[in-house]
Amino acid sequence: MTLRASDLKDGLTFTEVLVEDLTRTQIVQYAGASGDYNPLHTDEVFATKVAGYPSVFAHGMLTMGMTGRALTALVGDGNLRSFGGRFTSQVWPGDDLTATFTVTAVHADGGAGGGADGGAGGDGDGGEPTVDLAVRTTNQDGVEVFSGTATAGIEA
């Protein structure tokens, strides 16, 4: 998909299913890829008996990574200028996750958006067009598990 400034308006929403029925195997695979073997994520006995959680749970960065993958698919490779957020609830094995990206501003001339470091035409200097997005990932019950913002370069 190619995002164009002329096709976007505030409030326009894009939705993407990230995962259905997240498995413990996927969580452990992420632990291996990231090197984060915290037993809260990988050891059921530790998570339940020692830490008092109902189960192991996914790494926050796994959730952000899946959200970022969908975001990059939406805005196109090489177009993401900034992406950040916070983890608002745990993600459990068996969860279904859906990301929603909502346009909050379109800057046809580079506008006030741009990268978090002020780059990518962030001062309305006639740079590339950008779009600002509110990012929200929820589980199957509608509970928000990640909330953030992103800015991407787009076509005029």
Sequence positions of predicted segments:
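HotDog/MaoC-like acyl-thioester-processing domains
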Residues: M1-T13, V91-A156
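Catalytic strand-loop segment that frames the active site of acyl-thioester-processing enzymes
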Residues: M1-V56
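A generic structural signal for short beta-strands and their flanking turns/coil linkers
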Residues: L12-F14, L18, Q26, N79-F83, ...
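Residue-level structural signal for beta-strand termini and adjacent loop
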Residues: V19, G68, A150-T151
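Ser/Thr-centric signal marking residues that sit
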Residues: T23, T63, T137
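Short, intrinsically disordered, mixed-charge
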Residues: G32-G35, T72-G76, Q140
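Hydrophobic beta-strand-centered segment that forms part of the acyl-chain substrate-binding groove
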Residues: T48-T104
